[in-house]
Amino acid sequence: MSPSLEAARSAVAQQVKFDILTATQEADNEKSRQEIARSFISDTITVPTKEMYTYATLASLGDDVYSEPSTTALEAHVAKITGKEAALFVPSGTMSNQLALRTHLKQPPYSVLCDHRAHIHKYEAGGTAFHSGATSILVTPSNGHHLTLADIQEEIVLDDNIHLVKADLIRGSAPTEVVALENTLNGTIIPQEEIIAISDWVHSKGKKMHLDGARIWHVAIETGTPLKDLCDPFDSVSLCFSKGLGAPIGSCLVGTKEFIKKARGFRKLFGGGMRQTGLLAASAAYALTYNFPKLIDVHALARKLEGGLKEIGIRILSPAETCMIFFDPSTIGVDYVELVERADALPSPIKIGGSRLVLHIQTSPQAVEDLLALIRQLAEEKRAAGFVPTDITGTPSGNIYVRAKKPE
């Protein structure tokens, strides 16, 4: 090799070289963990523990496209506990949901019926329309909590009634092929008997049922219901490892062997075929074993926070059935922006995004106490300034998920 070529290669290697770790990385990571313990923005912010990292490094190192052993084992386990024939590991819950819809839907025109608050409608970048060419039928629960069979029967478009008559108006829509539910949705649990009633009727019409079960783990541990029973009414289910369970990445889609075989092809088409996923699969396995049981403590802490908010006079828009609380501080004269700013200004800041408070397996009980103390202080300040607390009752209507935003 000529000296000039060797020098050129060395120069290229120097250009490519990069060390992502800083001199203070360990301290920075610890600071980040402390901040996460005081954040109520989402349960997606949880981070892997050192124990999870250690466990993950022992996983097999194969290529998932060629049936990597650890990933294959995880898929088999998730299929077993959900009572389905097969499972597919994918990078995200969004991909899992969209793969399910794309696999179920054959020939347009067709529609997907879901709750108007559903993740597949609001937070998946229009994927239902883009990937599957499907329109969405958005339904508002008549009870303000969850979709019922009556809600679905009123809005579903069957093959023989594309000109749906409602409120003396005729509107055309594509026939519904999939009814998609979400459990939990905004932290609330759909009664299983309602799900079964919906499933029986939908299947009697020859349609499919999909469940966005990103947080189905919360339902299982809170109600003591086996995952198999929760998933049985559905043709496909998406389950997430990186939200409440605290794994760094990944979801599983479950269904029949034929369904998953087809979904695997779409996963490749979507760019979701991965290589050495053993580390990720092992992290998910660790989360199932060690983090899943912790969810019941998360729920208890959420109920404690809800109780404290009520005592102060805060209106609860949606109670802590699992890990989320939606609240309205206007009853004590405070708006979301003021609360966010005051929480952020604490010596040990607390992070809030708006009306939604999400607790997770790394939430500090002290953070709950500090948040309640701050809100109690704000209530006292408002009363001292002459504000008369209000008592708003009744079921809230409209969107209860309000993000704090300063007026422009």
Regions found by a protein language model. Name each.
Residues 2-363, 367, 371-408:
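Conserved PLP-enzyme active-site core in the AAT-like
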